[in-house]
């Protein structure tokens, strides 16, 4: 959930359509894995980001580029067709948002909730397991946890689940204390 990409209305519609197709043909998990892999590739490759975002490339060139990447990565045929369709319709600017929306739909379908845990230092496997267990008990759903390190927290955790933020960081406690002392 460290992802800040929001789906546009068009991206949401593409995600919903792809989601329904994957449910029909039973390829939900494979297509989701393909899309997550593509999103990671985009994050790692400036050239791929430029291909998706730049108006200098025609829709045809974008389609050829995305389908070539998909074939080389061994993506499902449905994923490859989806990428070609998005490019052909001139909607590559909506692609990352559509992927985020698709992943959300898939998680909701599986009864999984995504959570982002931000800590001052990297969590050990035992600490991560403890956070997952606590979230599962609090939310009543299986959490899919992503972690991020932010040294400015000084200690403690911040956990974001959907639009809710649980802030148990030392930084926020010190800020609260500072504010209380200024008011006194």
Curated annotation (Swiss-Prot):
Name of a matching Pfam family: OSCP
Entry keyword annotation includes Cell inner membrane: yes
Membrane topology: Peripheral membrane protein
Domain of life per record: Bacteria
Alphabetical UniProt keywords: ATP synthesis, Cell inner membrane, Cell membrane, CF(1), Hydrogen ion transport, Ion transport, Membrane, Transport
Subcellular location: Cell inner membrane
InterPro entries assigned to the protein according to its UniProt record, in alphabetical order: ATP_synth_OSCP/delta_N_sf, ATPase_OSCP/dsu
Chief location of this protein within or outside the cell: membrane
Entry GO CC: plasma membrane; proton-transporting ATP synthase complex
GO MF annotations, alphabetized: proton-transporting ATP synthase activity, rotational mechanism
Entry-linked NCBIfam families: ATP_synt_delta, PRK05758.3-2
Assembly, per entry: F-type ATPases have 2 components, F(1) - the catalytic core - and F(0) - the membrane proton channel. F(1) has five subunits: alpha(3), beta(3), gamma(1), delta(1), epsilon(1). F(0) has three main subunits: a(1), b(2) and c(10-14). The alpha and beta chains form an alternating ring which encloses part of the gamma chain. F(1) is attached to F(0) by a central stalk formed by the gamma and epsilon chains, while a peripheral stalk is formed by the delta and b chains.
Role: F(1)F(0) ATP synthase produces ATP from ADP in the presence of a proton or sodium gradient. F-type ATPases consist of two structural domains, F(1) containing the extramembraneous catalytic core and F(0) containing the membrane proton channel, linked together by a central stalk and a peripheral stalk. During catalysis, ATP synthesis in the catalytic domain of F(1) is coupled via a rotary mechanism of the central stalk subunits to proton translocation. This protein is part of the stalk that links CF(0) to CF(1). It either transmits conformational changes from CF(0) to CF(1) or is implicated in proton conduction.
Family listed: Belongs to the ATPase delta chain family.
Name recorded for this polypeptide: ATP synthase subunit delta
Biological source species: Caulobacter vibrioides (strain NA1000 / CB15N) (Caulobacter crescentus)
Phylogenetic lineage: Bacteria, Pseudomonadati, Pseudomonadota, Alphaproteobacteria, Caulobacterales
């Amino acid at each position: 959930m460290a992802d800040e990409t929001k789906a546009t209305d068009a991206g949401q519609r593409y995600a919903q359509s792809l989601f329904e197709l994957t449910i029909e043909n039973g390829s939900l998990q494979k297509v989701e894995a393909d899309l997550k892999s593509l999103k990671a590739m985009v994050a790692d490759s400036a050239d791929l980001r430029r291909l998706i975002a730049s108006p200098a490339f025609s829709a045809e060139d974008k389609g050829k580029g995305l389908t070539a990447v998909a074939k080389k990565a061994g993506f499902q045929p449905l994923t490859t067709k989806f990428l070609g369709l998005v490019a052909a319709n001139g909607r590559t600017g909506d692609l990352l948002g559509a992927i985020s929306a698709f992943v959300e739909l898939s998680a909701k379908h599986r009864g999984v909730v995504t959570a982002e845990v931000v800590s001052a230092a990297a969590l050990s496997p035992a600490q991560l397991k403890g956070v997952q267990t606590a979230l599962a008990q609090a939310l009543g759903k299986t959490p899919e946890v992503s972690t991020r390190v932010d040294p400015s927290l000084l200690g403690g955790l911040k956990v974001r689940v959907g639009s809710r933020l649980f802030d148990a960081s030392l930084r926020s406690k010190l800020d609260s204390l500072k504010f209380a002392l200024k008011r006194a």
